[in-house]
């Protein structure tokens, strides 16, 4: 999409907003392909920002954490079934704000990045994850043995 839109943006500038993930900023266990793909989106975004900034084209990426969407229902189960309840409970536990994000919150970030209010922001990957990535290691927050298996 970027390849085809850049020529149209050359005269008037604009804002490109790519969707990455916090998994592109720090690797998730057993998700190497996904981590690499999202890390690639982040570095692609930075490259576009550098290459086209003089044309008044800004490029940023959003890096959502766990957002309450149908994708979460498909991958982890709905908020009504046991698997979905367990997944959501675990996500809330490791999130300093104690909840999952909402699509509306992500949309507001995208709207801000598309607006002139963010005219001096480019080449950034902005996490919207409720503070999950503020921890050096999620196990620090858990205070129990749930993460010991991944340190061996």
Describe every region a protein language model picked out:
Residues 26-32, 54-55, 98, 103, ...:
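Active-site loop immediately N-terminal to the catalytic Tyr-X3-Lys motif
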Residues 2, 37, 45:
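Active-site helix of classical SDR
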Residues 7, 50-54, 119:
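Alpha-helical segment proximal to the catalytic Tyr-Lys
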Residues 64-74, 134:
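Short, flexible catalytic-loop segment of classical short-chain dehydrogenase/reductase
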Residues 27-36, 47, 75:
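Active-site loop-to-helix junction immediately N-terminal to the catalytic Tyr of the SDR YXXXK motif
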Residues 61, 69, 83-117, 121, ...:
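C-terminal helical subdomain
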Residues 111, 122-152:
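Short C-terminal tail/terminal secondary-structure segment
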Residues 21:
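Residue(s) in the substrate-gating loop at a strand-loop-helix junction
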